[in-house]
Amino acid sequence: MRRRRRRDGFYPAPDFRDREAEDMAGVFDIDLDQPEDAGSEDELEEGGQLNESMDHGGVGPYELGMEHCEKFEISETSVNRGPEKIRPECFELLRVLGKGGYGKVFQVRKVTGANTGKIFAMKVLKKAMIVRNAKDTAHTKAERNILEEVKHPFIVDLIYAFQTGGKLYLILEYLSGGELFMQLEREGIFMEDTACFYLAEISMALGHLHQKGIIYRDLKPENIMLNHQGHVKLTDFGLCKESIHDGTVTHTFCGTIEYMAPEILMRSGHNRAVDWWSLGALMYDMLTGAPPFTGENRKKTIDKILKCKLNLPPYLTQEARDLLKKLLKRNAASRLGAGPGDAGEVQAHPFFRHINWEELLARKVEPPFKPLLQSEEDVSQFDSKFTRQTPVDSPDDSTLSESANQVFLGFTYVAPSVLESVKEKFSFEPKIRSPRRFIGSPRTPVSPVKFSPGDFWGRGASASTANPQTPVEYPMETSGIEQMDVTTSGEASAPLPIRQPNSGPYKKQAFPMISKRPEHLRMNL
């Protein structure tokens, strides 16, 4: 699935990574690391002054959710007492959704225990490839921990995480609507009401992440999936930055060039305001057919982002033009959303004046595009280049050293929704309530990531309680995490309901056009 700039890698690998890898479907970026080929600081800054001063002021304070969550004591014997022990054999491979340098993503059906018969997406990562690079290990850690920590209607759900001797497995909800990238490629541009719907849902997801102290940093059409109803789901959390609160800044160079905020390119420190720049770049892309600043190569693209004037087509409404100008401000401190109100500032803009935010959060607003699906296993919204391949999870014959396996202690996870059904079946007794704790950032801008074997995965087993020589036998573990009440939406994470045949044909919401995107950003349909 590729469009204007589909990166090599599963669901887009960010532009700063240049690995030769296959395309993968947007919720699961496999290529975790690529060389930082952004050019020198001199290259970034040469050629004149910026149009606006690069003032990277602090972020205003905002409240962090530290809800108390009920915990259950989970052990090897309690979770796997009767029906199952989560492992690859619990899942039947159905289709290949994508693949990259570090593994594959499959559509699978659970064939044992809880959730039997339900359809999921299974992301498989090779340990031997990941442990070669501290940054890749940190990216994997961040993605797994954030997916456990965050539960929101517009963010992909992690159902299980487990491991074998040589592989890591993430079981995620299957998002049969495919990537927003695909819809943009088919349509060319979106009408403003269509773009407004998607941007509104995305803003709610970003706001929730920011409340948790998480900067997303990789917002682009390939990382925005659609569920069976057409609602947004943010995916691919490998580039997220954790524990960014109250004016804290980070310096890591990461993201996709065309959607990257100037302060990231300048490496002068950035905060959550970078996500609002990316939202503005995405909005511009939706309404015009291409990101706001593109060049013949990376150097020229960066130069344009830092110095060129924003050109707005005359057909845009005044509200759209005003929002774009306020989101795409090079001065991060004056950017809309950079203040204490964060997402609230963006959502209060007149462009969103027709949005009922409560109904939107409850997913009661009808999406502009609803995928035509024949069954819950439908893969029509994914690239046939992969879906027609025979799904095979290669034999797990690799062996890591004892010290290398220490990194993956505590990777195992079972979603609270699954544990609740297990709890009822086996009469678990509730333990004391304990506040969720936030773990530190997995990356540092100066020195390589250093691992603490006992607590690398944050919520995992310690070295003193697990046998590092037998990672396949790690017990199921979980911690209390926030539960979103989405019962009003009438929607379950998986399996995805089959669309009713009388729901009508798909109605186009935008005018198709010849793509203005650079060749490397296009998708050949």
Curated annotation (Swiss-Prot):
Polar residues composition bias: residue spans: 381-399
Entry annotation: catalytic residues: 218 (proton acceptor)
Modification type Phosphoserine: residues: 394, 434, 441, 447, 452
GO biological process terms, semicolon-separated: apoptotic process; cellular response to growth factor stimulus; long-chain fatty acid import into cell; negative regulation of apoptotic process; negative regulation of insulin receptor signaling pathway; negative regulation of TORC2 signaling; peptidyl-serine phosphorylation; TOR signaling
N6-acetyllysine found at: 516
Ranges of biased composition (kind: Acidic residues): 30-46
Stretches the record annotates as Disordered: 1-54, 380-399, 486-509
Domain AGC-kinase C-terminal: 353-423
Residues found modified as Phosphothreonine: 252, 412, 444
One Pfam family, short name: Pkinase
Catalyzed reactions per annotation: L-seryl-[protein] + ATP = O-phospho-L-seryl-[protein] + ADP + H(+); L-threonyl-[protein] + ATP = O-phospho-L-threonyl-[protein] + ADP + H(+)
EC class of the enzyme, as a word: transferase
EC number: 2.7.11.1
Activity regulation, per record: Activation requires multiple phosphorylation events on serine/threonine residues. Activation appears to be first mediated by phosphorylation of multiple sites in the autoinhibitory domain, which facilitates phosphorylation at Thr-412, disrupting the autoinhibitory mechanism and allowing phosphorylation of Thr-252 by PDPK1.
Compartment(s) where it occurs, according to its Swiss-Prot or TrEMBL record: Cytoplasm; Synapse, Synaptosome; Mitochondrion outer membrane; Mitochondrion
Claim: Acetylation is one of the keywords in the record: yes
Domain annotation Protein kinase: ranges: 91-352
Ranges spanned by the short sequence motif TOS motif, renumbered to the chain: 28-32
The family this protein is said to belong to: Belongs to the protein kinase superfamily. AGC Ser/Thr protein kinase family. S6 kinase subfamily.
Domain comment in the entry: The autoinhibitory domain is believed to block phosphorylation within the AGC-kinase C-terminal domain and the activation loop. The TOS (TOR signaling) motif is essential for activation by mTORC1.
Protein name: Ribosomal protein S6 kinase beta-1
Source organism (scientific name): Oryctolagus cuniculus (Rabbit)
Lineage of producing organism: Eukaryota, Metazoa, Chordata, Craniata, Vertebrata
